[in-house]
A protein has these predicted regions:
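Repetitive, compositionally biased segments used for assembly/scaffolding
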Residues: 1-105
Length: 105
């Protein structure tokens, strides 16, 4: 089972996820305890909702683009298996979001 890892090129304090070099409000993601969204120009189409159990797009969410959190694991709601189920490995939901949803690294 793969593990969530924060790329050495990114930083995250639990509230903001941004590149270590060249960070701007346009490539920084923020988490306010419910929503994960770009720091600048957030819309319902690029905002995700996290309720403590599911991570899904605010707009047009379905079982194929939603993730389920169970204990210290995050996995796709649909067709999950050992290769697409990740251990949080001590990282926040924002780091997991950057790795498995946005695929930033």
């Amino acid at each position: 089972m793969p593990k969530i890892e924060l790329s050495s090129k990114w930083s995250c304090d639990g509230r903001e996820l941004k590149p270590k070099s060249g960070a701007t409000s346009q490539n920084t993601w923020v988490y306010d305890g419910r929503y994960l969204k770009p720091k600048f120009s957030a819309t319902s189409k690029n905002t995700w909702v996290y309720d403590g159990h599911e991570l899904k797009p605010q707009f047009s969410a379905n079982s194929q683009n939603s993730w389920v959190i169970e204990g210290n694991k995050i996995k796709p709601q649909f067709s999950s298996n050992s290769s697409n189920t990740y251990e949080f490995n001590g990282h926040s939901i924002l780091v997991a979001f950057g790795q498995v949803v946005l695929k930033l690294w």
